[in-house]
Amino acid sequence: MTFTVLVSVRAKRDFNRLIVWLVERDPRAAARLGPLLEAALDSLTEAPSRGRSVGPTTREISIPFGQSAYVIRYRLLGSSVHVTRIWHGLEQR
């Protein structure tokens, strides 16, 4: 079964914020991060249940990058994956 991935406005803002922050510090790393996160989002169409459960319908995947990782949190609702947030693993949350 193929799932539809829907990215919330807030998650899109998270994505852009993370890229802008990294571009200011390391443009080459930022050029790698964008496609990496996009590939992770695309992978949810085929295997959304691979993320760890953090609630009844909420899951998250960790995407290694450098010495840390980025986190994508999402909800499974029927045949849809609703991405709610994206953040760097070292962010104060």
Curated annotation (Swiss-Prot):
Disruption phenotype: No visible phenotype when deleted singly or as the relBE1 operon. Gene3D superfamilies: RelE-like. Pfam families: ParE_toxin. Disulfide bonds: none annotated. The keyword Phosphoprotein does not apply. InterPro entries: RelE/ParE_toxin (IPR007712), RelE/ParE_toxin_dom_sf (IPR035093). Keywords: Toxin-antitoxin system. Toxic component of a type II toxin-antitoxin (TA) system. Its toxic effect is neutralized by coexpression with cognate antitoxin RelB1 but no other ParD or RelB antitoxin. Belongs to the RelE toxin family. This is Toxin RelE1. It comes from Caulobacter vibrioides (strain ATCC 19089 / CIP 103742 / CB 15) (Caulobacter crescentus). The lineage of its organism: Bacteria, Pseudomonadati, Pseudomonadota, Alphaproteobacteria, Caulobacterales.
